[in-house]
Amino acid sequence: MKNIAVIFPNQLFEISYLPYDPDSIDVYIIVEDSLYFSDNERFLRFNLLKLIYLRAAMKYYYDYLTDRGYDVIYLDWTGEPSLVFEYVSKNYGSCNLNIIDPVDYLLEERIAEFSDSYNQKIIYYESPGFILTNLDLKQYTGSKQGANKKFFQHSFYAWFRKKFDILMDGNKPIGGKYSYDKYNRQTIPNKIFISF
């Protein structure tokens, strides 16, 4: 059974950041998924420069992987939401599909439908695109700061700084405060000219 990694446009991570063993993957499939380019279910007006940049980055990532000896397939956008799923089913049949958490509800829903329709095994991995893991967030919501279920930026910020020992002196914040937001709220003086 083949190990296939599906890489969506927001998952162009360096090899060392991939949450699975890159050498255990038989084929990488980089897909221009319709949710990131143009989709019938979620109509969004994308900035043309963003689309050009996204495609260029994906093509670069294709070269990045192939230059390192990995077997890579690039699927161009067709407008079909099921593009990658039909491709995998047609060309590989049943396989282990390695997918980094897409952090997108509609895409997760499509992946689940594909898994059910084709009896496909999906192996999910936590996204390395975030500092905090899902477990970290669950721990925070169960902690004293999060136990009251009223989530405020200040309490989260203090918890985060303590957890990662950022600007901390033992158990106390350097400078005596966790946040200096009130100093960041001054308006730009009129005498300063800003050219756009």
Curated annotation (Swiss-Prot):
<protein>
    <recommendedName>
        <fullName>Uncharacterized protein R852</fullName>
    </recommendedName>
</protein>
<dbReference type="InterPro" id="IPR052551">
    <property type="entry name" value="UV-DNA_repair_photolyase"/>
</dbReference>
<dbReference type="InterPro" id="IPR007357">
    <property type="entry name" value="PhrB-like"/>
</dbReference>
<dbReference type="Pfam" id="PF04244">
    <property type="entry name" value="DPRP"/>
</dbReference>
<dbReference type="InterPro" id="IPR014729">
    <property type="entry name" value="Rossmann-like_a/b/a_fold"/>
</dbReference>
